[in-house]
């Protein structure tokens, strides 16, 4: 919320705990008002293990749990509405391009997943096919989702996404982004694996749905 990625009760965060349970932000409360004791602990079946008062887990918890189910390496999930990245999602446009070195190394191309009604199984079903190769997703007409081995990694990926969206928008206003050639992409991916040792998944040089 401090960066303007969410407003009011928007957005949600979850973290996998060492005992196999999950720490989740509560539903119906602004992120600016959340204190540690207001966080909710649930089990893998989304049953509440520990919660203060009447606090319940985020209404988007099904989306979070699908990430953990699909990927054993996921330790945290962040969902937010960063304005520029979400602008792409609302416009029906992906960020499925290879035009900035740092983004290629850190997260790769960013697909736009199909529309799904929040809080239902539609969103988990929509994102599932993309999780095998992506740590960062745009949710059509909704926002953005990032996963990571831990919370700081998932957060950094959301930050990287929003900055890239801003740069991409500026590039398109200037006539269009210039894509990096495949042979250069291969070199960057080598650096990702052998120098930076970036965790998570990467689609390689692959396009899903440029629009």
Positions of the model-derived regions?
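Glycine-rich flexible loops
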Residues: 1-211
């Amino acid at each position: 919320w401090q960066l303007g990625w969410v407003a009011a009760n928007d957005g949600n965060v979850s973290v996998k705990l060492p005992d196999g349970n999950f720490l989740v932000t509560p539903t119906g409360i602004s992120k600016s008002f959340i204190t540690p004791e207001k966080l909710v602990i649930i089990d893998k079946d989304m049953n509440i293990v520990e919660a203060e008062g009447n606090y319940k887990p985020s209404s988007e918890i099904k989306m979070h749990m699908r990430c953990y189910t699909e990927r054993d390496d996921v330790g945290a999930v962040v969902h937010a509405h960063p304005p520029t990245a979400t602008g792409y999602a609302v416009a029906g446009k992906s960020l499925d391009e290879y035009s900035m070195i740092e983004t290629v190394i850190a997260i790769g191309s960013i697909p736009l997943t199909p529309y799904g009604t929040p809080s239902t199984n539609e969103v988990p079903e929509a994102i599932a096919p993309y999780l095998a190769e992506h740590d960062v997703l745009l949710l059509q007409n909704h926002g953005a989702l990032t996963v990571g081995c831990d919370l700081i990694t998932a957060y950094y990926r959301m930050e990287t996404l929003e900055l890239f969206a801003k740069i991409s928008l500026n590039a398109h206003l200037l006539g269009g982004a210039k894509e990096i050639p495949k042979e250069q992409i291969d070199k960057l991916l080598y650096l990702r694996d052998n120098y930076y040792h970036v965790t998570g998944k990467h689609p390689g040089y692959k396009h899903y749905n440029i629009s």
